Amino acid sequence: MLDEVAHNENILNAVESLIGSNILVCGTTLFIKNPGEGGFVSYHQDAKYIGLEPHNWVTAWVAITDSNEHNGCMRVWSGSHKDNLKDHDQNFNERNLLTRGQTIKNVPKKKTTPLILKAGQMSLHHPTVVHGSDLNHS
């Protein structure tokens, strides 16, 4: 299933419109946040977490289920992609779905925007945008 999603023509066309036709899918990840399990994704930058340079790539997030603030949708720090890479601390919280636990401290939540998506919708973001997600409270 993940291979089909990663090579979906609509997704590839959207990515191509941003970075050109030389596209490489370097990985896929599922973040499963079931109700009551307490999982979250700490605020981080994919450029720091993944470590690919130059930063001329994008990350695609495809919602498998409806995603909203109540069930812990992704939040992005608006405009943070215009800044340099931020310092990340190692935070090995067992509930953090990032396996390496990289965390940006003191992200001003009032500057973050929830990415509310319906199942099947997609968000593309720059590798230096600060993003994370809260707990699933449903």
PLM region spans:
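Short, hydrophobic/aromatic alpha-helical segments in well-folded domains
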Residues: 14, 46, 60-63, 129-132
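Double-stranded beta-helix
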Residues: 67-134
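Short acidic/polar capping segments at secondary-structure boundaries
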Residues: 30-37, 47-48, 55-56, 64-69, ...
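Glycine-rich, flexible loop/turn motifs
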Residues: 1, 37-39, 45-46, 60, ...
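Short, conserved clusters of charged catalytic residues that mark active-site
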Residues: 10, 59, 108
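Short, conserved beta-strand element in jelly-roll/cupin
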Residues: 18, 44, 51-69, 116-119, ...
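Short, compositionally biased
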Residues: 136-138
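Non-heme Fe(II)-dependent double-stranded beta-helix
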Residues: 1-52
